[in-house]
Design a protein with these regions (language model features):
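Positively charged n-region of N-terminal signal peptides that target proteins for export
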Residues: 1-4
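Bacterial N-terminal signal peptides
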Residues: 6-15
Length: 150
């Protein structure tokens, strides 16, 4: 029984870190998108948010979630991003602000994808992801992520 408990704890710890072959060095979060469990990679620091999914050939299955300590404005660009993406912006309560399609930037100047409203989270997904992405949650988990953001 004790060996089983140790194995379960070890698996839980491993599940919280990004996969070695994914190109990511961030952790993942256990959240819900429209009530369905998702585990996006996290971009909690300014450095990680600036790097995002640049130079990666594969997008994580549940995307990458950019978390901001304060509501912010402004947009994202696709410089050095190799694959097209869908981006969904959410407010602090997890309600969708805007959804946009983004294409890789081949030369300067690169387009800026700006939702036109303030947001607290941005979720980058594979281009064409068909999930409605209307609500991100649960709220206590989102608040915890906001406290972790730098």
């Amino acid at each position: 029984m004790r060996a089983l408990l140790i194995a379960v704890v070890a698996l839980a710890l491993l599940a919280g870190s990004a996969g070695a072959g994914s190109g990511g060095d961030s952790t993942v979060a256990r959240l819900r998108l429209d009530g369905v469990a998702v585990r996006p990679e996290l971009a909690l620091t300014s450095e990680r948010r600036a790097r995002g999914l640049m130079n990666r050939r594969k997008v994580p299955a549940d995307g990458m979630l950019f978390v901001f300590r304060q509501s912010t404005s402004g947009g994202f660009w696709m410089k050095n991003t190799l694959v097209p993406l869908t981006i969904v912006f959410f407010d602090a309560s997890g309600k969708r602000v805007r959804r946009m399609s983004m294409v890789p930037c081949r030369e300067d100047p690169c387009a800026i994808y700006d939702p036109g409203r303030r947001y607290r989270f941005a979720l980058e997904l594979r281009a064409g992801d068909r999930r409605p992405a209307r609500k991100l949650g649960p709220l206590p988990a989102l608040r915890h992520l906001i406290r972790q953001a730098e």
